A protein has these predicted regions:
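Active-site and donor-binding regions of nucleotide-sugar-utilizing enzymes
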Residues: 123, 128-209
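Conserved N-terminal ligand/cofactor-binding loop architecture of enzyme catalytic domains
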Residues: 1-20, 28-147, 207-210
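Short boundary motifs at domain starts and secondary-structure transition points
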Residues: 20-31, 154-164
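Short alpha-helical segments and helix-capping/turn motifs at coil-helix boundaries
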Residues: 21-23, 52-54, 178-184
Length: 210
């Protein structure tokens, strides 16, 4: 994806372990951020130990101001009425802007980021609609509202500190729903490295090409 002078590309480096994901740092040159989108199916004892070590190491680095890290076992539910109203309004504002800029609860310092997020939302919305029967504005609104909510809930510190070469890593467990998987993909479009630990569930085959 490319938005303005910021773009991302999938790293050609092949990783197969949690430790490899922890240690990798993609390059940034000529406005292009190299990112990882890694999926590990099954968790053995080694992977569990490497995950614990990753939590310690990357949390310590974040505490020293060296990038952002977050690991989640599940994505939060958009349920509170005030949140539903806010993010439904954020979707309408995004649509009214021609899908060029997006607003969140998180105060964003970098003026480029709302446009980067907007472009990423448009891309994953297009992917959601591929081959989907009955795609309509209501489905579109509910999806984008959830995505913006998840960004605020999970990624707020990273959004506040964001710059094109900022180091961000996010880890999620047992992602199997298309909308959740597309959110994880969106994070890579913002420049984050993303790891999916699929111990119990995995994505459907049609999503593997992303």
């Amino acid at each position: 994806m490319q938005t303005g002078n910021f773009k991302t590309r999938r790293s050609g480096l092949v990783l197969s372990s949690v430790e490899g994901f922890r240690n990798v740092k993609g390059s940034f040159r000529d406005g292009c951020k190299e990112v990882q989108f890694l999926r590990i199916v099954g968790m053995d004892g080694t992977a569990l130990m490497e995950t614990a070590a990753m939590d310690r190491s990357l949390t310590e680095q974040m505490g020293r101001g060296q990038g952002f890290y977050n690991r989640k076992n599940s994505l939060p539910k958009l349920a509170a009425l005030e949140d539903v109203e806010f993010y439904s309004g954020a979707y309408r504002n995004w649509a009214d802007s021609g899908k060029h800029s997006v607003s969140l609860k998180t105060p964003v310092q970098n003026q480029q980021l709302p446009h980067v997020i907007s472009g990423a939302c448009a891309e994953i919305l297009g992917l959601l609609g591929q081959g989907k029967q009955g795609m309509n504005q209501s489905i579109e609104k509910n999806f984008i509202a959830k995505v913006l909510f998840w960004l605020d809930e999970i990624f707020s510190p990273a959004l506040q500190a964001w710059k094109p070469d900022y180091v961000m890593k996010a880890v999620f467990a047992n992602i199997s729903k298309p909308q959740e998987y597309l959110f994880c993909y969106l994070l890579t479009l913002l420049g984050a490295d993303v790891l999916l630990l699929q111990a119990k569930q995995d994505i459907p085959a049609e999503l593997e090409g992303l």
